[in-house]
Amino acid sequence: MGNKLKIINDPIYGFISFPFESIYYLIQSPYVQRLRRIKQLGLSNLVYPGAEHTRFSHSLGAMYLMTKALDGLRQKGYDITEKEYEATLKAILLHDTGHSPFSHCLEHLFFSCHHEDISKLIMKKLNCEKEVIEIFENSYKKRFLHQLVSSQLDIDRLDYLTRDSFFTGVSEGVIGTERIMNMFSVYNDELVIDEKGIYSIEKFIISRRLMYWQVYMHKTVVGADCLLKSILQRAKDLAIINKLDIKNYPISLNLFYFLENGTQEPNNIEALDKFILLDDTDIWNAVKTWSLHSDKILSYLALSLMNRSVGKMYVKNSEYTGEELQERHVSLFEKYKTQGFSFDAIKRYFATTGKMHNRAYSFNDEQINIWYKNGEIKGIHEASDQLDEIFLQKEIKKFYYHEI
């Protein structure tokens, strides 16, 4: 294989190369190539037109950063064998292969588990070495390798914050990725940060919180997600009673399988085989087809999404009471009464209630630890002057009522 096959031009990091041929062959596999057809930020491009980047570019970028992180740890004298190095690269490359179309928005439409569980099943289908799976699932003896793949300060987050900031144009996501990785060290097989890196970690935590509210939980994006879920809910309801009519309104048979049979368990091999053939294009093709459907509710919802008429979001700091919800439902029903939609249909497909919440830092997960020259280890909540325990523990909650 020529070297040119191992070089990729990334818009964030420039020309990047990978040291193992096995990595190249994994990239060429259908499971990784599928990620080209799944956008990293789902429907966020309805708000940020530049957010067209994919899970594929993120996975490659994360793998590149992993080579930098592992090389840095090796230069500091930490023992990472070639087999461990290669296995860790494979784990980060494949970490998102279990994502559904439109990523987190539709995660539980297909399977009753998280995408990480599907990623692990795909690793097994690819006959990955046991070290790859052990590192991914946190059962490998050197725990810092898993922490680089998945933790509160992992390579995944370092890449997606940088990449999402670049493509959305939201500068709050810019972090000192290079600086943070240079501060990585290992203590008792755990990933730690040299004390000089504390300010970069503070910036990282604050940037992630800001990106959540400005991008990931932007109210228009959440509203678009609600609309897409309503479309698929209506399609499922029609499929169950044999009224989706795929003969006259053809859609992907793999998508129809899930609409007809509902959410599946991850041990369903047939469902997994159909799932890995699905991507964003299957959903968009269905939405375009349904915009002409004879079912008025389905066609109205589908056409609304196609034309970016995603409805209104009403956000408040406390939960909606039953009385408030009823009042909004009645008002919405009056709006559509002339179109013949029933009150029950309005509640089921045209109105969605939910909660948006975000915490800058979780004390339930492994902590970000700072390593001082005197050998002392402190959690970031103890070491930081800016991020005390009260700030880090505070969970911001917003409750919404979305109407089409």
Protein language model annotation of sequence segments:
Residues 94, 98-99:
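Short active-site segment of divalent metal-dependent hydrolases/proteases
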Residues 1-87, 101, 105-404:
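Histidine-centered, transition-metal-coordinating active-site segments
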